[in-house]
Regions:
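Nudix hydrolase/Nudix homology domain
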Residues: 1-30, 36, 159-203
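Acidic, metal-coordinating catalytic segment for phosphate/diphosphate chemistry
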Residues: 24-27, 31-70
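Juxtamembrane/interface motifs at transmembrane-helix termini
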Residues: 47-51, 102, 194-195
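N-terminal strand-loop-strand
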Residues: 53-90, 118, 122
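Conserved Nudix-box catalytic region and its N-terminal flanking loop in Nudix hydrolases
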Residues: 74-112
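Unchanged
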Residues: 96-120, 128-184, 196, 200-202
């Protein structure tokens, strides 16, 4: 098993231990386990201790994966992408809020980032972010791609996105691949072409 996966498991054990332990000395030991694991991850990846602390900030108790939803919208054979602050592009989406469902979160992010009103249609795939996107995340993230029907658009530049445009799948701009990779866009296109024949992909 990959060392980084084992170290992430140690952090999860440490967080659960702090949450459930009733002994102050055991709590200190579990906190120390987290510190050591984060130091080892920082040595073995491109992540700093500060980034690791931020990634796990607010985490406690038994650890479960984070959920990231991505809205997939087609219009005239072109796919909707939003431009991030650094100039790269991605499918509109983000963390799933605890008050949302998969589809409602995808539609919320679609409106907030692209100014698009849509209707959730179907699930295309669920992927483990660390298996399909470059760069290692200290968190386990499940990326859920939801195909949505386009209804209307009223985009305005905001703190998250600079632009929202439709692109031909064979003429894509530079992607923010940690969020949406070229392979993921290609799979979304395959699903679009397959229509009802498409079978949901799940890791």
């Amino acid at each position: 098993m990959d060392e980084l996966v084992l170290l992430k498991e140690l952090i999860a054990i440490g967080l659960a231990g702090v949450f459930y332990s009733k002994d102050v000395f055991d709590t200190e030991r579990y906190e120390r386990i987290q510190v050591i694991a984060k130091q080892l991850i920082a040595q073995r990846s491109n992540l700093t201790r500060e980034q690791l602390d931020l990634g796990f900030d607010g985490e406690y108790g038994y650890q479960t994966p984070k959920v990231d939803t991505r809205a997939v919208v087609w219009r005239g054979g072109k796919i909707l992408l939003v431009q991030e602050a650094d100039g790269r592009w991605a499918l509109p989406g983000g963390w799933m809020d605890v008050t949302e469902t998969l589809t409602s979160n995808a539609l919320k992010e679609l409106w907030e980032e692209a100014g698009v009103v849509g209707q959730a249609k179907r699930l295309i795939m669920i992927q483990d972010r660390n298996l399909h996107n470059p760069g290692h995340s200290p968190l386990t993230i499940l990326k859920c791609f939801i195909e949505c029907d386009y209804q209307s658009q009223n985009f305005q530049a905001n703190v998250e996105t600079l632009a929202a445009e439709f692109f031909a799948p064979d003429d894509l701009p530079e992607l923010f691949e940690a969020k949406s990779s070229y392979q993921q866009i290609a799979l979304c296109h395959e699903a679009y072409q397959a229509g009802e024949r498409w079978q949901v992909l799940i890791d």
